[in-house]
Regions:
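Lipid interaction determinants
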Residues: 1-92, 99-167
């Protein structure tokens, strides 16, 4: 995936910039035929905001884990287990994106400046981008280029998973 610094942002800016609401977040097997997990639940809460100059802020949460701590305390004084339960149901990152195209279609690279997972900071989040019109509204499907590792507790053998994020 060579981008040759041929950023296509100006060509697609009018179709991509704006606020996007998450419709689904599913983890598929490597063939993308079977849903293996829905890590943020059946109705995930998510927003992606993309500015006209390419600043991306993505926020995704499992609504069943996103609420007041059971103790009623604020995060700053809640116990570690309570805070971890909520925090592990949230995924956020932001940074500037660049948009490219290769033989497989559009993809963007976001240089991560801030993230809920400190391991992402300074790295690249690369997503395949599919733009469509559905019922007169714009639709965007994002697929990570790299496999994502998640712990899945089951008696089934380990399966490679690819998330499909539809916005």
């Amino acid at each position: 995936m060579a981008n040759n610094n041929n950023d296509l942002w100006s060509k697609y800016q009018s179709r991509i910039a704006g606020g996007w609401q998450l419709m689904s977040y599913d983890l598929y097997d490597a063939t993308e035929t079977q849903i293996l997990a829905k890590p943020h639940g059946d109705q995930p809460l998510g927003r992606v905001l993309i500015s006209p100059n390419g600043w991306l802020a993505a926020h995704i949460a499992n609504p069943t884990r996103f609420g007041p701590l059971p103790s009623g305390k604020p995060w700053q004084t809640g116990d570690d287990a309570e805070v971890a339960h909520v925090a592990r149901g949230i995924s956020m990152y932001c940074g500037y994106l660049q948009l490219f195209e290769d033989g497989d279609g559009l993809y963007w690279e976001t240089t991560v400046e801030i993230s809920s997972d400190p391991n992402r900071k300074g790295g690249k989040e690369v997503r395949r981008v599919q733009l469509e019109e559905r019922n007169g509204k714009g639709s965007m499907t994002l697929r990570p280029v790299k496999d994502m590792v998640m712990e899945v507790r089951s008696s089934c053998p380990s399966t490679q998973m690819l998330p499909l994020l539809s916005l």
